Structure formats: C-alpha cells, structure tokens
From Swiss-Prot:
Entries under PROSITE patterns matching the protein: ADH_SHORT
Pfam family, one: adh_short
Name used for this protein in its record: Hydroxysteroid 11-beta-dehydrogenase 1-like protein A
Function text: Unidirectional NADP(+)-dependent cortisol dehydrogenase (in vitro).
Length: 291
C-alpha cells in the first residue's frame, strides 16, 4: 500500500508539473468579433463564461429559463465590452425549444463560432437511488438529448465558421459517483457522444473542435446548495473555472480538467487501481447527511 501511495503521489506531482509548464498562451484578440451562444448562462459557470467572452469583445447570446436574469447578464456583458449581447429565454426540457435557441442565435449573431453547452436540469436529488425512473429520464433528456439537439441545429453554422463546441461535463462522467446516478448517466452519455464527434471531425480534416470540460466541485449557488453539507471538500472558484474553460475553447483543446489536481490524477489511476480510487473518493462523503 505504501508503494501504491508513493506512485499516486509521484504521478500527481509529475502530471501537475507537466500541466503547468506546458500550458499554451491565449491571444484574447483572436476572440474579438466572434459569435458565441452560451446555454445555462443566467448564473454560475455559464454566466461567468459569458463575461469572459464579453471582455474579449465577442458577440454574445445567453439563454436560460429566467428572463430577468438573462437581461441583467446581457447588460453586464455590454458593460464589460461585448460587441453585442442578446438573450432568449428557453426551457431545455423541450427539444423544440433547444432547436429554436440555436436557430435564433445564428439569426441574431449572423452565424456562430462557439457553442457552449452548460445547462443542467432534471429533478434528481443528491442521495441514494430508490428506483424512481422520472429523474433518470429527465436528466438524460435535459443533460444529454438537448445538448445533441442544440449541436444538430447549430452544426451547419459551425461548419461554415470552422467553429468550436464546448461541453460542460464532470468527473462524474469519467468515474461513477454514488448518490448521482441519473447525473452520472447523462454525463457518461455526453462524454461518449462528443468524443465520437471529435473523432469524426478529425477524420474529415475539419478544423472544427470539441472541448469537453471535466469539472469538479465548483462554488456555484446551485452546487453549494445541493451538496455543500454532504461532501467534505472545498469548492473551486467559478470565475477561475470560466477563465480556464474559455482558454481551452479558444485554443481548441480536446479536454480541460478543472481543478486539474483534483481530477486528472484520479482519472489516470481509475483503471490501474479502481479500488484505491473509489476508497479515496468515498471518504469525501458525509454519509449522515445523505438519504
């Protein structure tokens, strides 16, 4: 066991060093005038991603369910330097609505360079699976099928611009996590679909890119409210997370791990030492607060 722990530590240090010393730099001017659609952008990571693109002079469209919050986010984008800022209220539980959002973005922005898929939904609580099917169906519908519908509707515009698709995934899409069965299922589906799509772009010699952001526990209002008293770990900054997501998108990186040191080592070791990884991760849960 001591040898395994030493190996784990060595890999963590090695990959962390590689990550920081091999990081590419991003030219913000390359984003000026680009056209960006961000879903789930009335709050949390999506809101912060909108602000990051706005600071670089992009044309922004934000979408979520709350109209007033979208108006506020769009106004803030303009203050931060967005070339233009638009908004449309939508419910991603309706695939027709998802298709409409993509078409509206293309029409209002005159095309599309970045499709950022960030919304999340479903009625599943953080707890033991008790056999209910509605949360599973809802999660797959909103967190997977609507992503595919948006991609399908925006694909022609993205092909014309040789643009980028950015998908918010999770460590739960790489390593099955307890108490989030429906959420895990939707994230594993995202990982499979968009990894496959990325390979298709490459085989067509297309410059289109797919960036999958594999995220950990981020200090969004929704995440903290849902799991804050159920896990013994610190949440990472949503502002820092958004900056890293935008950087990865602009550089057309296939994957982003954030926080890097909290996710990448476990993903690397999952297949080698699955029992050890599960034991370490399970220690973060406060079982007496989970039903």
């Amino acid at each position: 066991m001591a040898g395994v722990k030493l190996l784990l530590l060595s890999l963590c240090v090695g990959y962390t060093a590689y990550h920081f010393y091999s990081s590419e730099s991003m030219n913000p001017e390359s984003v000026r005038g680009k056209r960006v659609l961000i879903t789930g952008s009335s709050t949390g990571i999506g809101e912060q991603i909108a602000y990051e693109f706005a600071r670089m002079g992009a044309h922004i469209m934000v979408t979520a369910r709350r109209l007033q919050r979208l108006q506020e986010v769009a106004n803030e984008c303009l203050k931060l330097g967005a070339a233009s800022a638009h908004y449309v209220a939508s419910d991603m539980g309706n695939l027709t609505s998802a298709q409409y959002v993509a078409q509206e973005a293309v029409n209002k922005l005159g095309g599309l360079d970045y499709l950022v898929l960030n919304h999340i939904g479903g009625s599943a609580s953080f707890g033991f699976f008790k056999g209910e099917m509605d949360p599973v169906v809802g999660s797959i519908y909103i967190n997977f099928l609507s992503y595919v519908q948006l991609t399908s509707a925006a694909l022609k515009a993205l092909q014309e611009s040789q643009g980028s698709i950015v998908v918010m995934s999770s460590m739960s899409g790489r390593i099955g996590a307890p108490f989030t069965t429906s959420y895990c299922a939707s994230k594993f589906a995202l990982e499979g679909f968009y990894s496959s799509l990325r390979r298709e772009f490459a085989l067509q010699n297309s410059n289109m890119s797919v960036t999958v952001a594999v995220l950990g526990y981020i200090d969004t209002e929704n995440a903290v409210k849902k799991v804050g008293n159920k896990v013994s770990m610190s949440a990472s900054s949503k502002e820092d997370c958004a900056r890293e997501v935008v950087k990865a998108a602009v550089l057309k990186q296939p994957e982003l791990f954030y926080p890097y040191w909290g996710i990448k080592p476990f993903v690397l070791l999952r297949d080698w030492f699955p029992g050890l990884v599960a034991k370490i991760l399970d220690n973060f849960y406060i079982l007496e607060n989970i039903q």
